[in-house]
Amino acid sequence: MRTHIVALLIALTGSIAAAQGPALVVLNKAEASASIISLADGRTIATMPVGDGPHEIAISPDGQWAVAANYGGRTPGNSLTVLDLRTRRAVRAIDLGTYTRPHGIAWLPDGKRVVVTSEQAGAVVIVDVPNGRVDHAIATGQPGHLLTLAKDGRHVWTANIATGSVSLVDLDHGKVVKTVVTGRGPEGNDVSPNGRELWAADRTLNRITVLDANTLDSLASIPTGEFPNRVHFTPDGRWVLVSNIRSGTVDVIDAAARRAVDHITFAFDSTQANQTMLGTMGRSPQPEGILIAPDGRHAWIALSAMNRLAEVDLATRRVLRYLTTGKEPDGMGYVANLAAP
């Protein structure tokens, strides 16, 4: 008995010693890489290769793995890169075959599979990560771009930029429940923490469309800054953050009142700015990806034209610091307790 207790204590203390604290995994679109940034000191502690044009990333429920969707550049991408966050290495490339232009991605609750959009094939694809293969695909007939996964993992909502629509897809039964036109360019989307509302950002019409998450009936329209790209609820459901690429700001929207109450701004240095895949947009640092901490205290905004992230205190809505990334950061993932290598 004593031997077992000692062994257990050693295992526990060993796992505690191996913990390295919270970190971010950031995709750098223009250099086909992923950076791990320690939140303790803001330092990049590892950079790993991924496929061409990585846009979105998903962290496994246990925090040990990340999967990047390789959208591609001039040539359409058709792969996912699996990253081992403990060893800080890319360990596998999963070939998606004909399911090209993978973009939005999320882990399913089983911790073994991810769901990813294939924009070019018009499908939602379920991928078996441990076995490195496509499990099955659901034809949607829509060029799905970004997606939001329901908490129970049974449905996803996709924003279909090219057709100006959003779709609700039933993963259990492998079918599209409904598709509705919301405007001319919905991209970012998120579901309220209570699961009742879907918010979709239309980058062409500069507005948020609020929909009933179950019926996709339109409930409201909220004006935003120019070229809204991402939309995310805070964990308590009180606030919604919207990144406006052309305006160079992030709107803070009161979810209940359905109106913007603040606008977060960022430092911009034209001598340091680079042209992104979207070109140059005046004096905008081009805020794109948004990541909100699980406790709702901080948010990180990817400033793609400046090759850095802005860490924002959500209580004061002020930038606390800037974190250096690779070239053209966008998709991000949060790791609560990064394991030491």
What function would you assign to each model-found segment?
Residues 1-6:
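Bacterial N-terminal signal peptides that target proteins for export
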Residues 9-341:
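Predominantly soluble domains enriched in secretory-pathway, periplasmic, or organellar proteins
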